[in-house]
From Swiss-Prot:
This is Acetoin:2,6-dichlorophenolindophenol oxidoreductase subunit beta. One of its GO terms (biological process) is acetoin catabolic process. Its EC number is 1.1.1.-. Tetramer of 2 alpha and 2 beta subunits. It comes from Cupriavidus necator (strain ATCC 17699 / DSM 428 / KCTC 22496 / NCIMB 10442 / H16 / Stanier 337) (Ralstonia eutropha).
Length: 338
C-alpha cells in the first residue's frame, strides 16, 4: 500500500527497513544521533536536516555519531565494508568529499579490481548536493561528475520520493561503493511511496514525460525544472520527452539514444559546472552514436563555470531555470539538419 512521503522521510524509511532486515547495516556520521553523542541529546537532532531522526531509538548503537572528520569516519566505513559490514556514511554536504577523496577513489573504488574480484566494499556514502539553499560556495556544489569519472563507483541522484527509497535500498544491498546524492532542495518534495521494501535496479533511466518533438535529459532537481519547461512548451505546441537518468554511473545511454532517435532533438540539463559534466558526456555519446538521427544541434543547459554565489539574487541566476530549458528546446526546434 502506498502513501505520500517526503524524500526526507523516504530516506529515513529505507534506512530503517534495511537496518531491521540486515543486522550488518550500520550508520556513521556527524550528529546523526544527536548533539555529538551527548547522553542528553541522543536522538534530538538526527543529522543536520533531521533525516535520521528516530532511528537511534530503534537501532541503538548501530548509529554512531562521529567527530567532524570526514576522512576518519569515511575511512572507517570503507574498512568496515571490507570486513563484512554494510555501512552507510552520511556527509552533510558533498563538498566535504574533498577531505576523504583518497579513501573513496583510491581505496573503496579499487578494492574489487585489485583483489581479482574477490573483495567487496558494500558502503553507501550519502551526501547533500546542489545549490539554492543559501549555503554559499563551500556547501552548494553539484560534484556528481567527479565520481562518475572513477571506475568502481556507482553514483545515484534521485528526483522523487519513490525513486529515492527504491534506489537507496538498492544501494545498501549493493556489493560495491555507492555515492548517493540527495538534492537538499528536494527533501520536502512529497510523492507516493509503497510501505514495504523495494529496490530499483541501477542503470535504468525513467521517461517521466512522453513527447515527440525534443528530448530533455537530466537528473535530480533539474527533472522538476524540465517538467515545468515542458508544460510551457506544450502550450506552444512543442511536446518534450523528459528522461530522468536516476543513476549516473551506471548510465542508461540506451534509453537516451532511443529517445533521441524518436524526437531527433536533444537538450541536456545539468546543475554541475559545465566543464566535463554529465551533459557534456551525454552530448558526446549522442553525437558519436546517433548523429544521423539529429535534426538540430545538441543544446546544453548548465550553470556558468564559477563557484556558487552566496548572494540570493546571483545564486538564483546561477541555477539553470525552466525558462532557460524552454529556450534551449525552442532553439532545437528552429535548427536545420546538419
Amino acid at each position: 500500500m502506498a502513501r505520500k512521503l517526503s524524500i526526507k522521510l523516504a530516506i529515513n524509511e529505507a534506512i530503517d527497513q534495511e537496518m531491521t532486515r540486515d543486522p550488518s547495516v550500520i550508520m556513521l556520521g556527524e550528529d546523526i544521533v544527536g548533539g555529538a553523542g551527548a547522553d542528553g541529546e541522543k536522538d534530538a537532532w538526527g543529522g543536520v536536516l533531521g533525516v535520521t531522526k528516530g532511528l537511534y531509538a530503534k537501532h541503538g548503537d548501530r548509529l554512531l555519531d562521529t567527530p567532524l572528520s570526514e576522512s576518519a569516519y569515511v575511512g572507517a566505513a570503507i574498512g568496515a565494508a571490507a570486513c563484512g559490514m554494510r555501512p552507510i556514511a552520511e556527509l552533510m554536504f558533498i563538498d566535504f568529499m574533498g577531505v576523504c577523496f583518497d579513501q573513496i577513489f583510491n581505496q573503496a573504488a579499487k578494492f574489487r579490481y585489485m583483489f581479482g574480484g574477490k573483495a567487496e566494499t558494500p558502503v553507501v556514502i550519502r551526501a547533500m548536493v546542489g545549490a539554492g539553499f543559501r549555503a554559499a560556495a563551500q556547501h552548494s556544489q553539484m560534484l556528481t561528475p567527479l565520481f562518475t569519472h572513477i571506475p568502481g563507483l556507482k553514483v545515484v541522484c534521485p528526483s522523487t520520493p519513490y525513486d529515492t527509497k527504491g534506489l537507496l535500498i538498492q544501494a545498501i544491498r549493493d556489493n560495491d561503493p555507492v555515492i548517493f546524492c540527495e538534492h537538499k532542495n528536494l527533501y520536502g518534495l512529497e510523492g507516493e511511496v509503497p510501505e514495504g521494501a523495494y529496490a530499483i535496479p541501477f542503470g535504468e533511466a525513467n521517461i517521466v514525460r512522453d513527447g515527440k518533438d525534443v528530448s530533455i535529459v537530466t537528473y535530480g532537481l533539474m527533472v522538476h525544472r524540465a517538467l515545468e519547461a515542458a508544460a510551457t512548451l506544450a502550450k506552444e505546441g512543442i511536446e518534450a520527452e523528459i528522461v530522468d537518468l536516476r543513476t549516473l554511473s551506471p548510465l542508461d545511454m540506451d534509453t537516451v539514444l532511443e529517445s533521441v532517435e524518436n524526437t531527433g532533438r536533444l537538450v541536456v540539463v545539468d546543475e554541475a559546472s559545465p566543464r566535463c559534466n554529465i551533459a557534456t558526456d551525454i552530448s558526446a555519446q549522442v553525437a558519436q552514436q546517433a548523429f544521423g538521427a539529429l535534426k538540430a544541434g545538441i543544446e546544453m543547459v548548465c550553470p556558468p563555470h564559477t563557484p556558487v554565489p552566496f548572494s540570493p539574487t546571483l545564486e538564483d541566476l546561477y541555477i539553470p531555470s525552466a525558462a532557460q530549458i524552454a529556450a534551449a528546446a525552442r532553439k532545437t526546434m528552429k535548427g536545420g539538419k546538419h
